[in-house]
C-alpha cells in the first residue's frame, strides 16, 4: 500500500470520527431546541391566557383544564394577584401587570435562546455536510487508487 493511499485512509478515518462527534452535537442541539420550543409554546399560551382573562369580568364561569382532556368549572376571581412559578417548585404572588411582564421577559429570553440554538445547529449541520462531501471524495479517491493497483 502506498504512503499516499495510507494517508488518505487516515484522513478518511479522521473525518468519520469528526462526523460522528458532530452528529452527537447535532442530536444534543436538537434536544435542547425541543426543550426551548416547548417552553416558548407554554409561555405563549400563558401570555395569551393572561391577556384573555383581563377581558373577562370577575365572577364569570370558566372551564379550566386540569390535564388529560379533563376540565372543571371555576368562577373567575379578581385578577389583582397572579401566582407565578419561578422555578424549583417556588411560586410568588405578583400583580397582573408584573406577571404579564415576567411572562413577556421569559418569552423573549426563550425566543433568543431558540434563535441561538437554531443558528448553532445550522452551523454544525453545514460543517457536517462539508465533512460528508470531503469523506465521499476521499472514499472515491481511495477506491480509484485501489482499483488502479489491481
Q: What residue ranges belong to the model's regions?
A:
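Intrinsically disordered, low-complexity regulatory regions in eukaryotic proteins
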Residues: 1-86, 90-150
Amino acid at each position: 500500500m502506498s504512503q499516499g493511499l495510507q494517508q488518505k485512509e487516515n484522513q478518511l478515518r479522521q473525518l468519520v470520527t469528526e462526523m460522528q462527534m458532530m452528529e452527537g452535537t447535532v442530536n444534543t442541539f436538537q434536544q435542547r431546541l425541543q426543550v426551548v420550543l416547548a417552553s416558548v409554546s407554554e409561555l405563549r399560551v400563558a401570555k395569551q391566557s393572561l391577556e384573555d382573562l383581563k377581558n373577562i369580568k370577575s365572577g364569570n364561569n370558566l372551564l379550566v383544564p386540569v390535564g388529560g382532556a379533563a376540565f372543571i368549572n371555576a368562577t373567575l376571581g379578581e385578577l389583582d394577584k397572579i401566582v407565578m412559578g419561578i422555578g424549583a417548585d417556588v411560586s410568588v404572588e405578583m400583580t397582573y401587570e408584573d406577571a404579564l411582564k415576567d411572562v413577556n421577559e421569559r418569552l423573549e429570553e426563550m425566543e433568543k435562546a431558540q434563535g441561538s440554538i437554531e443558528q448553532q445547529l445550522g452551523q454544525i449541520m453545514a460543517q457536517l455536510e462539508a465533512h460528508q462531501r470531503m469523506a465521499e471524495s476521499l472514499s472515491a479517491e481511495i477506491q480509484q487508487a485501489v482499483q488502479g493497483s489491481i
